Amino acid sequence: MDDLGVIGKMAGVAIHDGWKPYRHYDVDHALCNAHHLRELIAVGVGWDQGWANDLADLLREAKRSVEAARTAGLDHLDAATLHSIRVRYGQLVAKGFAANPEPDVGKRSGYEKKAFSLLKRLDQHRADVLRFTTNFAVPFDNNQAERDIRMVKLQQKISGSWRTLAGARHFCAIRSYVSTMRKHDVDVLAGLRLLFEGQVWLPAGA
């Protein structure tokens, strides 16, 4: 990660799945809630734990609240809504710990380890889990990042590989440029037309 020189230079919010090496970087963090929903559903449905189902519902409700506020032209949740989300979140995590006390070392089943590890992450990094509720620039999940690399994997699946490293770099540059335009609500065809006319569109500050 250091060699790529991306995370160390960023000044925004790093949205990730909680992988510990990311914590070594001095940036604000947000955790991907698509991952949390999958894990909570696995615990709630697979092991019949109501707190997990309720917490998954709360995260979805918080997402809807943010979307409604954004649609209304707001850039924040009202204090009462935000307080309610935080209080209920804490109560559900506490219920989770009550149902899943820390297992004894050497006597942990696969389920116990997964459930307790999930609860620890949700508890210790609750501000990062809920960052999308306090900063509307932060998405609910990092699925967009995964979608950005999907075409690379699709190209590999169809063609096997690129014939040259230069070709791979050109492919990634084009996909990155198109993705950046979409994120800034720039019409892709119009942007590409400008590019071929020598009028390169770049995001503000680039």
Predicted regions mapped to residue ranges:
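Catalytic center-proximal scaffold of phosphoryl-transfer enzymes
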Residues: 1-206
